[in-house]
Design a protein with these regions (language model features):
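Oligomerization/assembly interface segments of phage tail-like spikes and tubes
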Residues: 29-47, 82-94, 220, 274-285, ...
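Short coil-to-beta transition motif at edge beta-strands of beta-rich domains
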Residues: 49-62, 289-300
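Solvent-exposed edge beta-strands and adjacent loop segments
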Residues: 1-33, 197-208
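Acidic, small/polar-enriched beta strand-loop surface segments
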Residues: 4, 186-322
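Amphipathic, non-transmembrane alpha-helical segments in extracytoplasmic/periplasmic proteins
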Residues: 40, 89, 102-130, 144-171, ...
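Surface-exposed cap/loop segments at beta↔alpha junctions
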Residues: 47, 54-131
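Short beta-strand-centered interaction patches in the first periplasmic/extracellular domains
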Residues: 77-96, 133-214
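Short beta-strand and beta-hairpin "edge-sheet" elements
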Residues: 59-89, 298-329
């Protein structure tokens, strides 16, 4: 894939292909592991006319057409010993973290419903982003107070069983404006098409981690004192579904102390889900496989012959271009779907 640029140098626009670089793009939907940034390392140029960033003077958009690997360069690191310059920036998703969703004046929460594209257009977004029309809708949804557009939109689309894709795509006659389009799409269940395992092929590295210290019993402690304190017991069944029905002998047991909450059950369920999500982690490094953020894939442990469905929540794309030689590598992180 070719990494392209659109540069604005004091109002003079130019565009083209980046050459001779090492790039690392990190994109994620994981609210507990928010990266969504990139680095591009190049040799120091011989003149400032070749720079791709200079504060208040040079702005540059980089992108791989039709993918999420792109964004705005927002900084640079110059190493005179190595004679290199490393450009840093936020991916398209990363720009969503720069904006805050606030409740409307006089209201406790921002509450929305209806067409998802219409809703997104009413939220604070970067001027580099546009929202494509969609037929997807949502019922009544309440945003948390004062959260980033990234977190709010991610939760909104998850609730609607949808996902988003952000990228620059050109069609005949289009101008190189540097505007990326947000497209709302269904979550793609690829478990019947894509299975990864240790014996998949020579191009895959699979790491499956299981934490057997994940609690099977969570005691949630809320408001009140001593015998009057609110206490809720939550359990995980054999399939790690959260239930309130007591399971005799369930262990390990943990305590969740949240005396400030007025919604102990919902907060306790949320905390328990976070713990369970960390019970099984699957990291995949693979080449030549069509996977995108939000896809559901199947992963098989060769030793136990156990299959689990996992959602792609993080993709790292690494690319090196040495002129006559080019390499690409993808690393995927997942969360097990239950």
């Amino acid at each position: 894939m070719d990494l392209m640029y659109i540069r604005d140098s004091n109002g003079i626009m130019d565009s083209g292909y980046l050459k001779h670089f090492e790039a690392d793009f990190d994109i994620t939907t994981d609210l507990d592991y928010v990266t969504n940034d990139f680095e591009i390392k190049m040799s120091l140029p011989s003149s400032d006319e070749e720079l791709f960033f200079s504060e208040n003077k040079i702005k540059t958009i980089v992108y791989v057409e039709g993918t999420e690997y792109g964004g705005e360069i927002t900084g640079s690191i110059i190493d005179t010993d190595e004679k290199t310059i490393t450009y840093t920036g936020r991916t398209w998703r990363g720009t969503l973290s720069q904006w805050i969703i606030e409740p409307p004046a006089g209201q406790d929460y921002r509450v929305v419903s209806g067409n998802l594209a219409t809703i997104l257009r009413q939220l604070p977004l970067s001027s580099y982003l546009d929202v494509a029309d969609t037929t997807y809708t949502t019922g009544t949804f309440q945003f948390d107070r004062y959260i980033t557009s990234f977190e709010g939109i991610t939760k909104l689309l998850t609730n609607a069983d949808a996902s988003l894709r952000i990228g620059i795509e050109f069609h005949e006659g289009d101008e190189y404006t540097g505007i990326a389009t947000i497209t709302i799409q269904p979550t793609r269940d690829a478990t019947g098409m894509i299975e990864v395992s240790q014996d998949y092929n020579d191009n895959i590295k699979l790491r499956i981690q299981r934490d057997h210290n994940t609690p099977k019993h969570l005691i949630c402690l809320g408001q009140g004192e001593l015998k009057n304190r609110e206490v809720i017991h939550l359990y995980a069944d054999e399939n790690w579904n959260i239930v309130q029905t007591a399971i005799p002998g369930a262990y390990p047991t943990e305590i969740y102390d949240f005396s400030s909450t007025t919604a102990l059950l919902s907060d306790g369920m949320k905390r328990y889900k976070e713990l369970i999500d960390g019970h099984e982690l699957i990291d995949v490094a693979i080449k030549d496989l069509d996977i995108r953020l939000g896809d559901i894939i199947s992963a098989r442990d060769r030793l136990t012959n156990e299959n689990v469905a996992a959602e792609i929540t993080n993709i790292i794309w690494r690319c090196t271009d040495y002129g006559d030689h080019k390499t690409e590598e993808y690393e995927y992180k997942t969360k097990v779907r239950r």
